[in-house]
Amino acid sequence: MKYAVVGFGTAGYHAVKKIRELDKEGCIDVYSNTERAPYNPMLTTYYAFGKLEYEGMFPFGDLEQIQKEVDFNLRKEMVIKVHGSEHLVETENGSEQYDRILIATGARAFAPSVKGLEPEDAFLMRTVEDALRFKDRLKKNDIKHAVVIGASMAGIKVVEVLHKYGIETWLLDLAPHIFPLAAYPEVSAEIEKRVEAQGVHLKFGATIDHMEQEDGQKIAVLTDGSRIPADIVGLCIGTRAITDPVKDEVAIVRGITVNDHMETSVPGVYAAGDC
């Protein structure tokens, strides 16, 4: 039996371990175009905060350790398309056929376009690269004011990091309260009190419309007309499933749809994780 796993994050890692546990002889090819071992995106803020060493973002060990523990082939190739009905994985270097294919491509942070926001002042928090870039900027000690868009779990962790560095911080969201998808309003109200007690500014029902300069200071102009000084902007507005390799092959509703066996609309093609 030949297996292909497209993507090597947490879902891909656990899938490879389970496949090898159930099939000692089958060929497992893992497609990943990153040099990094699988990591947990939620741990990136802990690294930026200084609560976690770099290695702590990789709970399963480095690639060498993982390959010693589990027998599989790591193919560092970009997957262009998965031809579902043909069970074919097409990469930049050619194509190969498999009996079973798992799509575990994950998700990417959503980065809306903000007029006037310079790329060097815009920060996401999803990948290891995001965490390294954010930490490097904080070390420059040139940030006095920050705005974070998105009152989410990731958003509040970024706010916590900024607050630790003594940076005046605003947390914005179009929703009426913090954690709009995860908490009841009365719970959110209590959390908001505690966040504000730490000196963080909260503003709901508004977001950034565009950026301006005023007397040398970068200003975030909000959709309600408010003006907030903002040397940097954190974009924590959620994620979007990475479905590019299968977008024309399987059923997708915001993400790849699966049945109770994690099988997509194409027999023999499965999906797991944030995709």
Question: Over which residues does each language-model region extend?
Answer:
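Phosphate-coordination loops involved in phosphoryl transfer and adenosine-cofactor binding
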Residues: 2, 76, 140-145, 205
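Glycine-centered tight beta-turn/hairpin loop motif at sheet-sheet or coil-to-beta transitions
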Residues: 91-94, 223-225
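Short hydrophobic core segments
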Residues: 6, 96-106, 228-238
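Beta1-alpha1 glycine-rich phosphate/pyrophosphate-binding loop at the start
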Residues: 1-71, 153, 159-182
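A conserved short coil-to-beta-strand element within the FAD-binding core of flavoproteins
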Residues: 76-86, 204-216
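Rossmann-like dinucleotide-binding cores of NAD(P)H-dependent redox enzymes
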Residues: 145-146, 153-210
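Glycine-rich dinucleotide-binding loop and its adjacent helix/turn
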Residues: 105-165, 258-260
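FAD-site-proximal beta/loop scaffold in flavoenzymes
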Residues: 118-139, 227-275
